[in-house]
């Protein structure tokens, strides 16, 4: 019967590790949204265009 308390200690320890690892830091840099042509700018067609006019 010594196995059950040891199991509960391990289970609570594993759940606390999962809970701590899921939290993100406050100053975590968010991924910027990519628009067309994998560009960060919303209207980037003139930048990637092969013609001299937009």
Curated annotation (Swiss-Prot):
GO terms for biological process: angiogenesis; apelin receptor signaling pathway; cell migration involved in mesendoderm migration; coronary vasculature development; embryonic heart tube development; endoderm development; G protein-coupled receptor signaling pathway; heart development. Residues 1-23 form the signal peptide. Keywords: Angiogenesis, Developmental protein, Differentiation, Gastrulation, Hormone, Secreted, Signal. It is found in: Secreted; Secreted, Extracellular space. Induction: Up-regulated following myocardial infarction (MI) (at protein level). It comes from the Eukaryota. Transmembrane segments: none annotated. Expressed in the placenta. Expressed in syncytiotrophoblasts of the placenta labyrinth at 10.5 dpc. Expressed in placental chorionic trophoblasts (at protein level). Expressed in a small population of epiblast cells in the distal half of the embryo at 7 dpc. Expressed in newly formed definitive endoderm cells in the proximal half of the embryo, while it is not present in extra-embryonic endoderm at 7.5 dpc. One of its GO terms (cellular component) is extracellular region. Coiled coil: none annotated. CDD domains: Toddler. Its main location: secreted. Interacts with APLNR. Belongs to the Elabela/Toddler family. This is Apelin receptor early endogenous ligand. The gene is Apela.
């Amino acid at each position: 019967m010594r196995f059950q308390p040891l199991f509960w200690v391990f289970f609570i320890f594993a759940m606390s590790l999962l809970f701590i690892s899921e939290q993100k830091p406050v100053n975590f840099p968010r991924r910027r949204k990519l628009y067309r042509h994998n560009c960060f700018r919303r209207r980037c067609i003139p930048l990637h265009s092969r013609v001299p006019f937009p």
